[in-house]
């Protein structure tokens, strides 16, 4: 899968958080993921059992944060407007109430920040396979989790949760999949 410009709106607006995503699969298993953030001179690579970042020519191993508490977690999403379904909007808002802080606007870079230990959770909705496949080996090999909201493989895209660990992931899933999320707070 190739996504030549992930974060098209960022690219058009001159915001340097867009990137090129490339994944390689063998027998329906993603075996290589590469994210290039050219404006920042950063490249993220995951394959085999390793994940690393190359920044200005220097290679460093990627490791997710060790935080295991949802209330201390940082949450990222590209935009709350990508949650087109009202139930998903409410679910995201409920999750937002349970974390320390929320940041918007990261596109593919949010996932790279998670793999590099700067972010705890990334939640998105409506992703295509080319938006997410390259990120799987990077996040998993850095020690994180990348699944759909219903705990499935991300290969087909959809509603995605990336987390630093299973404990935070399960709490996120529980909140996002609650049958009747609070209806009193929409994101817009």
Model-derived features with residue positions:
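DPxDG-like acidic metal-binding loop motif
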Residues: 1-52
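A structural micro-motif at secondary-structure boundaries
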Residues: 54-58
């Amino acid at each position: 899968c190739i996504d030549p410009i992930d974060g098209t709106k960022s690219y058009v607006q001159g915001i340097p958080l867009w990137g090129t995503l490339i994944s390689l699969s063998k027998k329906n298993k993603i075996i290589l993921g590469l994210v290039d953030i050219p404006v920042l001179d950063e490249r993220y690579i995951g394959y085999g059992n390793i994940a690393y970042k190359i920044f200005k020519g220097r290679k460093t191993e990627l490791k997710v944060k060790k935080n295991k508490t949802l209330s201390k977690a940082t949450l990222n999403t590209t935009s709350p407007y990508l949650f087109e379904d009202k139930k998903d909007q409410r679910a995201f808002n409920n999750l937002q109430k349970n974390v320390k802080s929320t940041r918007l606007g990261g596109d593919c870079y949010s996932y790279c920040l998670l793999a590099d230990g700067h972010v705890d959770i990334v939640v998105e909705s409506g992703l295509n396979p080319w938006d997410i496949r390259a990120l799987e080996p990077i996040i998993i090999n850095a020690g994180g989790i990348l699944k759909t909201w219903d705990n499935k493989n991300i290969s087909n895209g959809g509603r995605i949760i990336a987390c630093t660990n299973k404990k935070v992931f399960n709490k996120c899933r529980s909140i996002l999949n609650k049958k009747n999320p609070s209806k009193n707070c929409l994101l817009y």
